Amino acid sequence: MLNDTDTIQRYPLRHPANTNLHLHYGEAFEGFLIQSEVGPFIREYLSDLKRTIDLALAEYPRVLAYRVDLRLPQGVDLPDFAYTNQVISRFFESFTKKIQYHQERVAERGYSRGCKVRYVWSREIGQGGRQHYHLLILLNRDAYYTIGRLGSDRVNMISRIEESWAGALGLPVDLMTGLVHIPKNAEYLIDRVKRQGKGDELADLFYRASYLCKKATKSYGDRQRGFATS
């Protein structure tokens, strides 16, 4: 029979590389299912994810949420900041400005609904030490109801993301092929008040986004954050 010491050794309560972070085990968090097969998770990250979604729904009754992955190019000389958190800060600064600019333009025609950009990101180190970012972006669905189509000639959410990532890396936008990845079924339409006969996309979203909160493949001790929210 396991005693308390055995249990703690088998299931540590704190992250061994950052004891400020607490580990979360199990299949759910505050009533939402999570991807337990990739756990354990960082409890603080799960809390921040839920808080960010709650803030978006508190501000807007209808929210468009979607997943994006950003990668660094190989075989290309990049500035030193590309390997630090500065690059993702530059990305969101550019992306937010693009949304603000678009809302200002549509406001001139009397159509602006307003849109605060909210987000969650995680920085992970993959095979061969390759750094990449997983993102969840949340927008006012009365302002933006879809992310658009990859490769479209029209300006859409994907083209704004590509331009912002190119600018963050200091590269031409035509080199973004393969560096901006939109996962399958990336979009989630969530409502403050669940509509009758509509599936629970909020629960689906939290399950999907819980992947960003997992302990594995994050780097600590390099003075760079592995996770942040707006």
PLM features per residue range, with description:
Residues 2-8, 12-20, 29-60, 141-230:
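Catalytic "initiation/cleavage/transfer" segments centered on a nucleophilic residue
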Residues 118-144:
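Histidine-centered divalent-metal-coordination microenvironment in nucleic-acid enzymes
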